[in-house]
């Protein structure tokens, strides 16, 4: 039986910048349990970026017992739209136009993802 999402003790946080993307796995008190980073601009294709992020996250996920321990993901991104889950025309990112970042991470990780503006 799959556990209730409210019982999962950790969340993934992503601070996305034009140069670096820093990921942290935190508990309910905000204590960082694991972290990793990738170069944001090294991936001109958003799908390659998400794949690299998931790969970089794997050792951190292993430290906390795997993706089954993750409640969701929060993403702070330039021009992030909380209502749509998209990054919209961010000048300091390599991807242009509308980028459905929350949906891409939901699909890749299988957990809910939300985005907010961190310009």
Which ranges hold each PLM region?
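Short, well-ordered beta-strand segments
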Residues: 13, 74-76
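Residue-level structural signal for beta-strand termini and adjacent loop
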Residues: 26, 37-38, 93
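A general structural motif
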Residues: 7-8, 67-70
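Residue-level signal for inorganic ion chemistry
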Residues: 23, 38, 75
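Gly/Thr-rich phosphate-binding beta-strand-loop-beta motif of the actin/hexokinase/Hsp70
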Residues: 2-33
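Glycine-rich phosphate-binding loop and adjoining helix at the ATP-binding site
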Residues: 50-54, 69-72, 79-119
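N-terminal phosphate-binding loop and adjacent alpha-helix
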Residues: 32-68, 100-103
């Amino acid at each position: 039986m799959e556990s209730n999402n409210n019982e999962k003790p950790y969340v993934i946080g992503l601070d996305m910048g034009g140069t670096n993307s820093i990921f942290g796995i935190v508990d309910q008190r905000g204590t960082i349990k694991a972290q990793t980073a990738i170069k944001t601009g090294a991936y001109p294709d958003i799908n390659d970026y998400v794949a690299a992020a998931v790969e970089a996250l794997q050792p951190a996920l292993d430290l906390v017992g795997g993706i089954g321990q993750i409640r969701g993901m929060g993403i702070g991104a330039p021009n992030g739209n909380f209502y749509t889950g998209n990054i919209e025309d961010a000048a300091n990112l390599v991807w242009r136009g509308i980028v459905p970042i929350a949906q891409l991470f939901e699909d890749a990780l299988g957990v809910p993802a939300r985005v907010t503006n961190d310009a």
